[in-house]
Amino acid sequence: MTAPIWLTAADTALIGDRLCALGWLAPDEALTDVASAGDGNLNLVLRVFAIGRSAILKQARPWVEKYPTIAAPVERSAVEASFYQLVRAAPALRTFMPQLLGVDPAWHLLLMEDLGEQADAAALYHRASTDAAARTQLIAFLAGLHALDLPLAALPDNRAMLELNHAHIFTLPFAGADSDLAATAARLGQRYLLGAGPLLHGDFFPGAWVYGDDGVKVIDPEFCLFGPPEFDLGVMAAHLIVSGDPPEAPDHLGAAYQSAGGGAVDSALIRRFAGIELWRRLFGVAPLPVVLDHRRKDALIALAAGLIRA
């Protein structure tokens, strides 16, 4: 197995050679362009073009893309590939996600179906608030995902990524919080670290939703894990609140999830995970991708603390 080469958008010839070597480009094909496919926080994400077609190329490099000083395990690429394969094997879920076209374990590459350009953050959050049909589809996706009967061995070992995520969700953002709030976050973090429960997307927010003529699609499951379903629901609820939903969004979402065929969930736990997501997006390294004035930010901080203590 050859040592990986860490790519950039400027490496058109190198990328073309690698795609040809993998059989992802025909011998008589060539790349016509390579461009960034968005502001990925974790992975390098490129859009690669050949005559008449395009695809998304993702590489897991040994650091966090947005914060290169933060190390991240490259094995996350294999975990993400497994998630796509598991979902594509489920008839009720496969239409929700882009097709995985190829996996290169040596260079930690995934080649994905190109769903087209994604809207900017403001448009995504507005649509999350106003597109009732898409919201229904997203809830149905979570209900179906969490219903999959899978052994823990269905995913490659993900412990290093789980611990990195745990630190940036439940620990580091609470360094300046009061001791009671930090202690509650720590207890919730232990639930996350257990690795027990159904398969979760792990980062179910508007940046992972792509809207098209045939409905909404779900992307970027690189934070996937086995865990409590309330975590996915709490993350979604937090971002629905940011998009304009009322503070009761966690309760409303839990009820809609069960109406969609999801299993029994703990409403209080959804609220707490929603509070955690709000707090870590306000104080952690992955801030909300929308502009907040001081009044709105202060209101969200107070709401987050209240939800965590619920």
Where are these regions (language model features)?
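Active-site catalytic-loop/activation-segment of kinase and kinase-like phosphoryl-transfer enzymes
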Residues: M1-D11, A147-R191, F283
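Juxta-kinase regulatory segment immediately upstream of eukaryotic protein kinase catalytic domains
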Residues: M1-D33
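ATP-binding pocket architecture of kinase catalytic cores
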Residues: L46-L152
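Active-site Asp-x-Gly
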Residues: Y67-A72, R76, L199, G212-H252
